[in-house]
């Protein structure tokens, strides 16, 4: 039985808001992540309200209530705050300057805006990782490749110069003509010492699922990029050789308690997550190091909420690739495979409830993203029904409109029975082949 009492918040304008507890959880965003947060809230018997632009956005169908407004509409977020105990975000595309006045007036964002600030851009993430001395990919801001500005030409009227003497000085050419001055071509952009092609160029903000990423193979690619983008908004990273891509989702509550889900392997198709394997086929020491990285980040930021970390594993050891201040595609398997899912953890934290157990309930799991393939709506529907009929398969359909090639339409999670690493890998391959016979991958040449 959940106790109920009156909660009061006094705004700076004197307005007093009274409401019963437990209060609603507020989410800015209405996509598939918000939809799964709403499903988790419903299981916990907690109301959840979303702010999202369209009535047919995925989360609206499962949320307790909704506010139809653009995500950047601050007045709509103010209204969301009036209905909710605290607010969290579905994604990191935030305008902190617009939200800061609300936080100053008492609106509670989790994570708070100060914790989010270094995580909203790839450049900010890289700087944070460097400050914490965490192993990450070597990088430089794109403007570092630009040549220094040319030195100013000497001005004959500068102090200490004798303009008359300069004008009366005899010619050294013997012809009476002023000598020709050869102006060298300005130097072009250059990679700094220690970097060599190929390198990865990334937009600092807004990139996801392969968007905002370019492979630069040579000097011509670099010069072409500089003609097309503002260098201040991009960075360059060394192209890292790696054996596997890994990910870990971690949570921290208001009291500083930290819980980590198991380390997983992720696989990409055209830079979009294709499948996730739990547990990752690595040693215990690798997972322990990943958990230490998570604790370091959460503690340094005084972060409250769910944080997801992507890693490279290879010759350079375990290197942090990117951070996501939210629930993450790599953690969808936790809905069935763990005691408390990443979505339930986020809802619990925002609602002020104790975290649940992240411990696994299965020996292993395979999560497969269902990306829109080449085909019409009936073809996708037939494939969806076939997947739903599979034994032991847990289908999550997001209810999105439109079949843009490669779009994430849902995901499927299947248990893996073996506790032996090699046998589990063989089981993963069998299950994946079975899924791909029903739901093919989109072609490699998608736009």
Give the label of every model feature segment.
Residues 1-127, 131, 145-178, 185, ...:
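ATP-binding N-terminal substructure of ATP-dependent carboxylate-amine bond-forming enzymes
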Residues 3-5, 10-11, 21, 46, ...:
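Peripheral (often C-terminal) accessory segments that flank ATP-dependent C-N-forming ligase machineries
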Residues 30-31, 51-54, 90-92, 112-113, ...:
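Fold-independent oxyanion-binding glycine-rich loops
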Residues 59-60, 204-206, 403-407:
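Short, flexible turn/loop "capping" segments at secondary-structure junctions
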Residues 118-247, 251-297:
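Active-site nucleotide/adenylate-binding loops and adjacent lid/helix of ATP-dependent enzymes
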Residues 228-282, 288-320, 324-332, 344-357, ...:
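Phosphate-binding core of ATP-grasp and ATP-grasp-like enzymes
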Residues 335:
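A conserved FAD-binding loop/helix module that cradles the flavin
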């Amino acid at each position: 039985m959940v106790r109920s009492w009156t909660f009061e918040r006094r705004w700076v304008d004197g307005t007093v808001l009274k409401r019963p507890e437990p209060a609603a959880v507020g989410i800015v965003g209405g996509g598939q992540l918000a939809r799964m947060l709403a499903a988790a809230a419903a299981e916990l018997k907690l109301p959840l309200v979303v702010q999202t632009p369209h009535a047919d956005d995925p989360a609206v169908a499962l949320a307790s209530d909704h506010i139809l407004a653009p995500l950047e509409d601050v007045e709509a977020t103010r209204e969301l705050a009036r209905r909710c105990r605290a607010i969290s975000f579905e994604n990191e595309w935030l305008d902190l300057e617009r939200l800061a006045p609300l936080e100053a007036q008492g609106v509670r964002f989790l994570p708070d805006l100060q914790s989010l600030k270094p995580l909203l851009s790839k450049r900010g993430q890289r700087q944070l990782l460097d400050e914490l001395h965490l192993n990450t990919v070597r990088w430089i801001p794109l403007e570092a490749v630009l040549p220094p500005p040319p030195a100013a030409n000497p001005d004959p009227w500068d102090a200490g110069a004798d303009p008359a003497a300069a004008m009366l000085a005899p010619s050294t050419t013997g012809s009476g003509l002023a000598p020709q001055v050869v102006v060298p071509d300005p130097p072009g952009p250059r990679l700094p010492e220690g970097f060599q092609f190929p390198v990865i160029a990334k937009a600092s903000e807004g990139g996801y699922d392969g968007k905002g990423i370019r492979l630069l193979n040579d000097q011509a690619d670099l010069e072409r990029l500089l003609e097309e983008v503002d260098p201040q908004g991009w960075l360059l990273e060394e192209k890292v050789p790696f054996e596997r891509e890994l990910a870990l989702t971690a949570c921290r509550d208001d009291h500083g308690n930290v819980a980590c889900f198991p380390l997983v392997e992720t696989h990409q198709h055209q830079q979009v997550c294709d499948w996730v394997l739990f547990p990752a086929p690595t040693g215990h020491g690798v997972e322990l190091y990943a958990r230490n990285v998570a604790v370091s980040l959460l503690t340094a930021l005084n972060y409250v909420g769910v944080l997801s970390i992507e890693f490279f594993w290879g010759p350079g050891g375990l290197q942090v690739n990117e951070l996501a201040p939210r629930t993450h595609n790599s953690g969808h398997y936790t809905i069935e495979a763990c005691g408390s899912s990443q979505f339930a953890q986020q809802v619990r934290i925002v609602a002020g409830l104790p975290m649940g157990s992240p411990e696994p309930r299965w020996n292993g799991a395979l999560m497969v993203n269902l990306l829109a393939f080449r085909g019409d709506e009936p073809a996708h529907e037939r494939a969806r029904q076939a997947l739903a009929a599979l034994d032991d398969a847990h289908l999550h359909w997001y209810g999105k409109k439109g079949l843009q090639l490669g779009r994430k339409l849902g995901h499927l999670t299947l248990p893996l029975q073996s506790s032996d690493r090699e046998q589990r890998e063989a089981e993963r391959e069998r299950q994946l082949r079975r899924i791909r016979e029903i739901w093919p991958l989109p072609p490699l040449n998608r736009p």
